[in-house]
Amino acid sequence: MRALDTWKLTGAGYYSYLSVNVVCKRTCLKKESTPQREEAVQTAVRSHANFAEYVPFTFGLLFLAELNGAPTSWVHAAYTALFAFRVSHATLGMHIGNGMNLGRKIGFLGTLAVMLGAGLYLSLIH
């Protein structure tokens, strides 16, 4: 069984959570028109968009790495790290923090590290 088979449901589940969060922020806070409401909606939208920008591409790189012989345990570790970094970025960094706290920075840099690591692996195998 490929590592992607284990992690695709986790990715889809977290993306769905972020999608529902956007809908909730837009509808539940619709009655208010305050700067706090607008900021909450914007934060939810950015968290959702950031996931959509980085995760599908990184999933593709990790899938290709595994198809090209990367050890499944390494790929599982990379998916685990990617998920932890995305939660750190979105949930801890953007929703709980003030938007530019340590959780967001670690999440962003960690995501880049996983993406670049997978890309580097693919570059070096040929």
Model features per residue range: what roles?
Residues A49-L64, M115:
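Core segments of transmembrane alpha-helices
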Residues L61-A84:
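Short alpha-helical packing/oligomerization segments
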Residues M1-G13, V75-Y79:
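Interfacial segments of alpha-helical transmembrane regions
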